[in-house]
A protein has these predicted regions:
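Short loop/turn segments immediately following the C-termini of beta-strands
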Residues: 40, 93-95, 139-142, 199, ...
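Short loop/turn segments immediately following beta-strands, especially the blade-tip
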Residues: 52-53, 160-165, 206-214, 262-268
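N-terminal export signals
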Residues: 5-26
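Repeated scaffold domains used in trafficking and secretory/extracellular systems
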Residues: 70-81, 121-128, 180-184, 227-235, ...
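Residue-level detector of Asp-centered blade-edge/turn motifs that repeat once per structural unit
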Residues: 83-84, 130-131, 189-190, 237-239
Length: 338
């Protein structure tokens, strides 16, 4: 969608931003970063360089999801470093089967699926909790199974029973926390909090663990409210900010791209999100983030009737296009947690 080229120099301040503040997008630096996308036409995770606008031809790296109903509509992918399985891509798919979608860890070096599980909801986002080996999914709704509904909506944690092990492969062994419309999850390694976004809320959770350090649940410690469906949640790799998107059009006053920060107040012994400020007054943005050099990149849908685009937008230069592609989300490939 080319309307972003008309908006690159325009910033709409949020209701919580300082009155009269105005920002103009800075030109991108020349640093060459790698971008990972989920592409639903081929149903692949693909890697490209942000140094080129032509993304046609074979991707620099790609992985094709199996041709089964639970693997349809890849929805998220994030590159993470593990101690026992090297660099992996944690990924999820909405799925179309009555049993739901999928979550998985795919090893980068040989593209082997080292772990996977069916998630009865429609997984929109996935994360790995560093230091615990747990996989987290966010599902916007439950998925029908036969004549009943399984509790697949919300936040679901697949937690290894021992340190260094793989998570369970059965959803029955996962830990579930309700969150209507859950669309995004992110492990905040600086604050050691799990962040999640869904209908009308951005939440922060602390991990609840047993005496052996194994996760047994989540404790909600902070909430930021807004109107609409929170869609994506990403770090700002150029600052300590958290970036999130809220869906909708002009009928929703809180649509667009927002930033905030999570902080702990030792005086009150409480966690809180900073007052948010709106970066851009955009509609239907599916993902948005900033690279370490400040370059912004995003995927937006042409309208409310669809959810993909053949284009990934970048600040300071022309967009990157792959003819016939259906990009749903774009991520910074090179981010790893130690």
């Amino acid at each position: 969608m080319k309307r972003r080229s008309l908006l690159r120099a325009v910033v709409t301040t949020g209701v919580a931003a300082a009155a009269g503040a105005a920002n103009v997008r800075l030109a991108a630096a020349a640093t060459d970063y790698l971008i990972v996308v989920v592409e639903q036409a081929a149903n692949q995770i693909q890697r490209f360089s942000n140094g080129t606008t032509d993304w046609n031809g074979s991707p620099e790296w790609y992985w094709s999801a199996p041709s089964t109903d639970t693997w349809k509509y890849l929805a998220d992918a994030k590159r993470r470093l593990t101690a026992n399985w090297d660099d992996v891509l944690v990924c999820c798919a909405n799925g179309t089967a009555s049993t739901g979608g999928r979550a998985a860890m795919v090893r980068e070096s040989d593209k082997a699926v080292v772990w996977t599980a069916v998630v009865p909801g429609n997984p929109h986002s996935v994360e790995r909790i560093d230091g615990h080996g747990a996989i987290v999914t966010a599902s916007a709704k439950q998925r029908a199974t036969g004549d009943s509904y399984e509790d697949g909506g919300g936040i679901n944690l697949f937690v290894p029973s021992a340190h260094g092990g793989l998570p369970p492969t059965s959803f029955a062994d996962s830990i579930s926390t309700g969150f209507p419309g859950a669309h995004g999850v992110l492990w905040d390694d600086s604050n050691e909090c799990l962040l999640a976004i869904g209908d009308n809320e951005l939440r922060a959770y602390r991990l609840v663990t047993n005496s052996g350090g194994i996760i047994t649940g989540l404790s909600k410690v902070a909430t930021l409210t807004f109107s609409g469906t929170g869609h994506d949640l990403q770090p700002d790799y150029a600052s300590p900010d958290i970036l999130y998107t809220v869906g909708g059009d002009a009928s929703n006053p809180d649509h667009g791209i927002w930033k905030t920060r999570l902080a702990y107040d030792s005086a009150t012994a409480a966690w809180a999100f900073a007052s948010p400020s709106r970066l851009y007054d955009w509609y239907f943005t599916k993902s948005f983030s900033r690279l370490p050099d400040g370059t912004e990149f995003w995927v937006d849908a042409p309208s409310a009737a669809t959810w993909w685009n053949d284009t990934v937008g970048f600040s300071g230069r022309a967009d990157s296009v792959r003819t016939g592609a259906k990009f749903y989300k774009a991520r910074f490939w090179s981010h790893v947690l130690s």
